[in-house]
């Protein structure tokens, strides 16, 4: 008799959650995703200042608009030589991490109305998508070669001391079976004016709500370096030829706001998931 009463109470609690909590939850998830998507998709340029307070290795300005870098005007000292890194006026650099981030948010918004009838599946799907997004925003490009670490107005990251993080985030899509491996590529040298010399390679990534600039000095056969300079290549291909690496980081206020919103949404999903799992396990135990 007591078991039947307990089961009845648990069923009523589950019904109350579905009636009073879930509608507001779905609405807040949809609104939060739309707000984050609008922020990250804005075409208004975000100007990022790269400075090196302890050294003068890297200094200048980078502008991001939506998922593209649209302006680069940076000076970099590599060895004894100072290079001017200036993106051509008509050129853009695609930030694949931000493009993937936008795609995931579009996918989440697409799934929400189609999965709401199946609470357990919808919550699980949202957990996976949001986990992938948060991993994507915190992914760190692995570094195995010698580099010079450059701080900026955002805290610099010691990549060699982050191996445990890299192992979890070098593939930020691993929690979704259909997702590809994140690949970091170089920028074609001819997109700059003047073009970068063939012994230099430049790449951008996103980490900890910052835009990260990675500059590589290369050594090797001229034909290999010329091939790298003409193409956008996977950073992994450069590693045998890297003699120096310089990293600079500048925190992006829009990425910071998006990260905060998505982290809050992730917490909401986890809280609702925990409540339903608790009710389900209690209901099972009462039978």
Curated annotation (Swiss-Prot):
Phenotype of null mutants: Leads to mild sensitivity to a range of drugs including doxorubicin, cycloheximide, and bleomycine, as well as to calcium.
Function, as annotated: Component of the RAVE complex which is required for stable assembly of the vacuolar ATPase complex V-ATPase.
Cited InterPro entries: RAVE2/Rogdi
Record bears the keyword Hydrolase: no
Domain of life: Eukaryota
A Pfam family assignment: Rogdi_lz
UniProt entry keywords in alphabetical sequence: Cytoplasm, Nucleus
Example of a GO biological process term: cellular response to calcium ion
Entry keyword Cytoplasm: yes
Subunit composition and interactions: Component of the RAVE complex composed of rav1, rav2 and skp1.
Organism whose genome encodes this protein: Schizosaccharomyces pombe (strain 972 / ATCC 24843) (Fission yeast)
Name used for this protein in its record: Regulator of V-ATPase in vacuolar membrane protein 2
GO cellular component, as recorded: cytosol; nucleus; RAVE complex
Compartments it resides in: Cytoplasm; Nucleus
């Amino acid at each position: 008799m007591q078991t039947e009463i307990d089961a009845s109470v648990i069923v009523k609690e589950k019904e109350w959650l579905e009636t009073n909590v879930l509608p507001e939850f779905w609405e807040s998830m949809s609104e939060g995703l739309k707000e984050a998507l609008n922020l990250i998709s804005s075409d208004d340029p975000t100007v990022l200042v790269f400075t090196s307070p302890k050294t003068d290795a890297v200094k200048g300005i980078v502008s991001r608009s939506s998922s593209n870098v649209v302006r680069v005007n940076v000076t970099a000292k590599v060895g004894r030589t100072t290079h001017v890194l200036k993106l051509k006026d008509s050129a853009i650099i695609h930030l694949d991490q931000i493009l993937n981030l936008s795609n995931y948010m579009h996918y989440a918004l697409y799934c929400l109305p189609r999965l709401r009838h199946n609470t357990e599946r919808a919550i699980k799907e949202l957990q996976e998508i949001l986990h992938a997004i948060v991993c994507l925003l915190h992914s760190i490009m692995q570094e195995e070669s010698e580099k010079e670490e450059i701080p900026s107005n955002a805290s610099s990251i010691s990549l060699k001391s982050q191996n445990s993080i890299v192992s979890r985030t070098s593939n930020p899509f691993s929690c979704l079976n259909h997702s590809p491996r994140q690949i970091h590529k170089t920028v074609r040298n001819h997109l700059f004016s003047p073009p970068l010399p063939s012994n230099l390679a430049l790449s951008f990534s996103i980490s900890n709500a910052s835009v990260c600039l990675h500059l590589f000095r290369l050594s090797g056969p001229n034909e290999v370096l010329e091939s790298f300079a003409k193409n956008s290549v996977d950073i992994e291909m450069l590693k045998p030829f890297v003699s120096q690496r310089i990293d600079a980081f500048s925190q992006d206020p829009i990425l910071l706001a998006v990260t905060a919103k998505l982290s809050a949404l992730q917490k909401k999903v986890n809280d609702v998931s925990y409540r339903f799992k608790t009710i389900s396990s209690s209901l099972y135990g009462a039978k």
